A protein has these predicted regions:
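Residue-level signal for inorganic ion chemistry
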Residues: 42, 137, 227, 305
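Catalytic beta/alpha-barrel core
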Residues: 28-40, 49-61, 69-80
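Single conserved hydrophobic/aromatic residue that forms the stacking wall/gate
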Residues: 2-9, 13
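C-terminal accessory subdomain/extension
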Residues: 232-358
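Glycine-rich loop at the start of a catalytic domain that most often binds anionic cofactors/ligands
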Residues: 14-28, 41-49, 64-68, 195
Length: 358
């Protein structure tokens, strides 16, 4: 079972629909999203498989969840009581997955150490409230993608605690959960014992990161633009805001329509290279809101209209992430919705979207 690509690449519901359709056609049998808006959008576009909302949903939306057959994560007693009350009011049953906090210290019933008994009791209560159908139970690993004995020990502790909670809750309730899940990308790649009934690969679906490379997966996304104009400047010319870069020779400078409003982190100013047909072109000066400048002095065949790759097959996103001091996932999330999307299958573009028109 796969996790939906509902996280990342900007606030883009249409993209989620496209990729979710592909996952549905490819055999995935459960999707996960972060909000009710995303889940309902999938339903309105023919996605019929079960959908789990991992994030917060206001109690006022419970009737909408039930109407659209959407599963909701329950992370604490207060939310369980709210959802139960609203489900009873509208005369329906809300399918839920109980979240257990085993060491992420974020969402979920706290069950570690002295909190084990109270956590188990709280989960049992949530599973038996009227109007709720506790289909599943899950947790989230904090360091499964990190290497080292300390991290491996912590992940093992989280998993053992999770299974202990499940055993105790099932024993008290006298029935078993249909779906138990905890394996995120790191655990999918490194801890097969944690796969249980369902896995949640996030970044792995995009083919990014070391784990994807180890598994032979290929990146599914590239970000490209074109050169919009080219000018030649004498030595000593200050480029862009603040004049942090000055040409040290006669320089052929190209302008590329990609800036921080599109998702190009300003901290990468004067540090990153964009890829042209003739090789890498250094980005010069501060990145602007809507554009940036690249040095094309030694690339005379690159002209106005020539393609430039921000990241992709020829310009790995992992390098960009390293320079920015972040992870590839944050960079994909940062690509704004004003960047047009093109969907390619079998080498051909089968759909184009300018999301601002949506």
């Amino acid at each position: 079972r796969d996790r939906s690509p509902s996280r990342g690449l900007g606030d883009v519901y249409k993209r989620q629909v496209q990729v979710s359709r592909l996952l549905q056609e490819s055999g995935a049998d459960y999707l996960a999203v972060s909000s009710i808006d995303e889940a309902v959008e999938l339903r309105h576009n023919g996605i019929t498989m079960p959908v789990l909302i991992l994030g917060h949903t206001p109690k006022e939306e419970v009737s909408e969840l039930i109407k659209n057959n959407i599963t909701q994560a329950v992370t604490c007693r207060a939310k369980a009581l709210e959802y139960s009350e609203e489900a009873v009011k509208c005369g329906g049953t809300l399918k839920i997955h109980i979240k257990v906090d085993t060491g992420m210290s974020r969402l979920g019933y706290l069950c570690d150490g002295d909190y084990f008994e109270s956590g188990v009791e709280g989960i049992c209560e949530g599973c038996t409230l009227p109007g709720l159908d506790a289909e599943g139970i899950f947790t989230h690993f904090a360091v499964s993608d990190e290497f080292g004995e300390e991290y491996e020990s912590y992940t093992k502790h989280q998993f053992e605690l999770f299974t202990s909670v499940i055993d105790e809750v099932e024993k008290k309730l006298g029935k078993k959960f249909k779906i138990r899940h905890c394996a995120n990308t790191g655990a999918v790649a490194r801890y097969p014992e944690t796969w249980l009934d369902m896995v949640r690969p996030g970044l792995l679906l995009y083919g990014y990161g070391d784990f994807a490379q180890e598994l032979g997966l290929k990146p599914v996304m590239s970000l490209k633009t074109t050169v919009s104009t080219i000018k030649t400047y004498p030595a000593g010319t200050a480029i862009s805001y603040g004049g942090i870069y000055k040409t040290d020779r006669k320089t052929r400078m190209g302008v590329v329509p990609y800036g921080y409003a599109d998702g190009y982190f300003r901290c990468l100013s004067n540090r990153y290279e964009l890829m042209t047909e003739e090789g890498p072109a250094p980005q010069r000066g501060k990145i602007c809101m809507d554009m940036c400048m690249i040095d094309l002095t030694d690339k005379m065949n690159v002209d106005v209209g020539s393609e430039v790759e921000i990241f992709g097959k020829a310009n790995p996103i992992e390098h960009m992430a390293q320079l920015a001091g972040t992870i590839p996932y944050e960079l994909t999330c940062a690509v704004s919705k004003r960047v047009p999307r093109m969907y390619i299958k079998d080498g051909k573009v089968y759909e184009k979207e300018l999301l601002l028109r949506g």
